Amino acid sequence: KGVTRLEKYASCAFAHFMAYGLRLSERQEYEFKPLDWGNLFHKAMEHFAGKAERLDIPVTDITDEMRREMVDACVEESIIDYENTVLYSTKRREYLITRMKRLVDRTVWALLRQQKMGDFRQTGTEVRFEGGVIDRIDTCEDENQVYVKVTDYKTGSKSFDITSFYYGLQLQLAVYMNAALELERKKHP
């Protein structure tokens, strides 16, 4: 490192002073990474679930127009929460926001459709337990049984694989389901 510093000084004393005296470096430009994409999606879904719970109507009565308006608002709120207004700085990034809105809208549409077609009802969102946070819990009750469904919001295309589960490579959903079952057992002794 010392030799590099000497070489830097020999090539340009001013550059040496800027780098080692003032400790300046090139400004890092913001990049919207896959982790940011996933966090933004997750936050938008969380906002939607909260808004849906506060509605005066059952979520199964949400119209397509209401859903789209809520999704737009939720994505915008999640961008603000994520302190990421830099997303509006280029046309490409604005396009990413449009894509995010479409992805969230498709996901919400599918979840609402599942609720309309079945007997499961959302009973919890962002449910914390000692091993993590379950994005969503739905339950269905009949006279002597409670059925539980957990949803983990993901932006990728990874699906559950029983072989990976068997070898301990894909345990998250099973751990979440076990935690959800324990929580339901406490509610229904």
Regions inferred by a protein language model and the residue ranges of each:
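Non-catalytic protein-protein interaction segments used by genome-maintenance enzymes to assemble
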Residues: 124-184
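A non-catalytic, helix-rich entry segment at domain boundaries
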Residues: 43-129
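Short, well-ordered loop/turn and helix-capping segments at boundaries between secondary-structure elements
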Residues: 19-23, 27, 46, 50, ...
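Active-site-adjacent bridging/hinge elements
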Residues: 12-22, 72-80, 138, 144-155
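Beta-sheet entry/capping signal
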Residues: 6, 14-15, 119-123, 135, ...
